[in-house]
């Protein structure tokens, strides 16, 4: 089986040898070869075959005639073209049809069909390179879906009364000031042009001029996160840098059959009253039927990029107007200079617990109280907390790790069991109160300096 590929802009042929003995999983040999079509283009029999995009894993080798070959150990069908491609000489489309069905024209290797396409692409690439340092923005869209989502929702006609209301609002100084700061509010840069021409546009016999058409913008489809499954497991691709999530990656759906099914689901939502649901876009599905290669991408927000460049751990540090909790609502008051953070506790029993504790620092000594609050408290009158013997250990990053001693904890549990007074309290202690599932995740309060002995501290804890 042979397969032609493109390399450095030239057509080269690479021979792929697919033998049953070379496959790791021989059961997939018959399965994949039942889907693949031999050849690429008109063969010796004179019959054109269907264009396919496949992925091949194997090892390179040389044939007896010293021809470079690839022995395949696994072949994956990535995308299939469900249409016959036009022949270079006998299958050219008329110019009018090629303008509408540009997908087949672009896939054709005939240079006489539309030579301006290659010049157009090269010119656009060179222009983008020249204008990369300026505010110039290309207004040409490669793919436009005119009838999408809310654009078809109930549109109101621009009547004379509505035009006067819009004109009065546009004359307001506050609106003018807002438009001057349009970059902050992401307003359409053509809004001023249309508002100034509202009297002309609202005429019943209005015909758009050339400038009206050039300044108009059509809502296009965007790319959102795409969830894909591999071996019945769902994965999310995340670009991570400096132990922080920077961007979510996504892959495009290139299966036209599945894409049509998704459009049908959207139509069902439309029948239920969802006006934002899309109709079946036959042009988009037809383009997918011409074998879209595996496509992926990712989007990095400016805020996360600034976080990465400025080494900020919280996105609120880079936002101009972050969402903050109002003062006085569900807020806990701490002494001046208090800092809150989270610390993880790693007991010797391999269970990860998160505790709430306080530091009491003084110039001469440091006393640490570890306060554990059981989330599964079911007994009234029982202790709501306990103190454990801990030994501090500081990590390189400045976080504090606390490792409990299993021996000390067992001795403490024996004392606790001996001190209980009611069967209900004994039942609560025997139900595993010191496991990770029974402990709340609490905040950590750090007091940098408190020159008070523990006995006279204003903070009260339950007795051990």
Curated annotation (Swiss-Prot):
Region (G5 motif): 382-387
Pfam families: G-alpha, tRNA-synt_2
Domain G-alpha positions: 33-415
Region (G4 motif): 306-313
SUPFAM superfamilies: Class II aaRS and biotin synthetases, P-loop containing nucleoside triphosphate hydrolases, Transducin (alpha subunit), insertion domain
Positions that bind GTP: 41-48, 147-151, 214-220, 239-243, 268-271, 310-313
Keyword Magnesium recorded: yes
Binding annotation for Mg(2+): 48, 220
Region (G3 motif): 235-244
UniProt region (G2 motif), positions on chain: 212-220
Any one GO MF annotation of this record: GTP binding
Keywords: GTP-binding, Magnesium, Metal-binding, Nucleotide-binding, Transducer
One Gene Ontology biological process: G protein-coupled receptor signaling pathway
Stretches for region G1 motif: 36-49
GO cellular component: cytosol
Functional note: Guanine nucleotide-binding proteins (G proteins) are involved as modulators or transducers in various transmembrane signaling systems.
Family: In the N-terminal section; belongs to the G-alpha family.
Subunit note: G proteins are composed of 3 units; alpha, beta and gamma. The alpha chain contains the guanine nucleotide binding site.
Name of this protein: Putative guanine nucleotide-binding protein subunit alpha
């Amino acid at each position: 089986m042979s397969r032609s590929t493109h390399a450095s802009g030239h057509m080269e042929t690479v021979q792929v040898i697919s033998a049953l003995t070379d496959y790791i999983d021989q059961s997939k040999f018959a399965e994949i070869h039942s889907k693949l079509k031999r050849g690429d283009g008109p063969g010796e029999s004179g019959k054109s075959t269907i264009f396919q995009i496949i992925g091949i894993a194997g090892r390179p080798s040389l044939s007896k005639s010293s021809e470079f070959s690839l022995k395949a150990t696994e072949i994956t069908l990535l995308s299939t073209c469900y249409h016959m491609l036009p022949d270079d000489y006998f299958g050219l489309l008329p110019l009018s049809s090629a303008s509408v069905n540009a997908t087949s024209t672009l896939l054709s290797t005939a240079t006489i069909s539309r030579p301006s396409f290659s010049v157009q692409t090269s010119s656009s690439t060179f222009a983008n390179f020249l204008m990369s340092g300026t505010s110039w923005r290309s207004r040409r869209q490669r793919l436009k879906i005119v009838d999408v989502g809310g654009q078809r929702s109930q549109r109101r006609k621009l009547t004379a009364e509505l035009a006067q209301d819009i004109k009065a609002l546009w004359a307001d100084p506050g609106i003018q000031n807002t438009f001057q700061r349009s970059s902050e509010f992401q307003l359409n840069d053509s809004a001023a042009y249309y508002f100034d021409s509202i009297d002309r546009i609202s005429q019943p016999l209005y015909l758009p001029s050339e400038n009206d058409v050039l300044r108009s913008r059509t809502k296009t489809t965007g790319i959102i996160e795409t969830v894909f499954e591999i071996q019945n497991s769902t994965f999310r691709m995340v670009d991570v840098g400096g132990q922080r999530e920077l961007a979510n990656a996504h892959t495009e759906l290139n299966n036209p059959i599945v894409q049509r099914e998704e459009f049908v689901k959207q139509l069902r939502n439309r029948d239920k009253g969802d006006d934002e649901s899309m109709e079946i876009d036959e042009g988009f599905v037809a383009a997918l039927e011409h074998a879209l290669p595996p496509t992926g991408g990712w989007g990095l927000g400016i805020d996360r990029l600034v976080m990465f460049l400025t080494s900020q751990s919280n996105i609120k540090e880079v936002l101009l107007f972050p969402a903050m909790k109002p003062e006085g609502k569900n807020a806990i008051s701490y002494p001046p200079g208090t800092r809150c953070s989270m610390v993880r506790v790693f007991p010797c029993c391999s269970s990860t617990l998160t505790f709430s504790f306080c530091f009491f620092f003084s110039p001469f000594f440091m006393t640490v109280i570890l306060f554990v609050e059981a989330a599964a408290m079911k007994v009234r009158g029982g202790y709501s907390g306990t103190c454990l013997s801990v030994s501090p250990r500081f990590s390189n990053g400045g976080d504090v790790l606390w490792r409990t001693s299993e021996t000390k904890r067992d001795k403490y549990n024996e004392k606790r069991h001996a001190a209980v007074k009611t069967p209900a309290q004994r039942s609560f202690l025997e139900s595993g109160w010191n496991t990770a599932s029974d402990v709340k995740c609490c905040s950590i309060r750090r007091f940098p300096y408190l020159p008070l002995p523990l006995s006279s501290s204003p903070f009260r804890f339950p007795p051990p």
